[in-house]
């Protein structure tokens, strides 16, 4: 079992536990160049809000560098604003098997500061 398989196994277990809660899910995906955040509906079938460093407005603001904690903070603020605009106040945080550290933590903290509850 390699590093990615272990991460996917952890992510699967987390998603099963979140599904039992029947609450909207804030999922985070991290790559070397970008960070992505999506808010899924309670049943997990619809994306209610999304934000990433690949968006044109975000790239312009970051001058093309989307792989750092400053970029993750900006994405966290944007996802919280979009989720609140869609009527979502509380979510369950799905870190997709990534460690709660660095960019993932920066995104979560920024989303909390912007008013999203989890």
Curated annotation (Swiss-Prot):
Q: Which UniProt keywords apply?
A: Ribonucleoprotein, Ribosomal protein, RNA-binding, rRNA-binding
Q: Which GO terms describe its biological process?
A: translation
What transmembrane ranges does the database entry give? none
Q: Which GO terms describe its molecular function?
A: 5S rRNA binding; structural constituent of ribosome
Q: Which GO terms describe its cellular component?
A: cytosolic large ribosomal subunit
Q: Which domain of life is it from?
A: Bacteria
Q: Which InterPro entries match?
A: Ribosomal_uL18_bac-type (IPR004389), Ribosomal_uL18_bac/euk (IPR005484)
Function in brief = This is one of the proteins that bind and probably mediate the attachment of the 5S RNA into the large ribosomal subunit, where it forms part of the central protuberance.
- Subunit structure of this entry? Part of the 50S ribosomal subunit; part of the 5S rRNA/L5/L18/L25 subcomplex. Contacts the 5S and 23S rRNAs.
Give the record's family classification: Belongs to the universal ribosomal protein uL18 family.
What is the name of the protein in this document? Answer: Large ribosomal subunit protein uL18
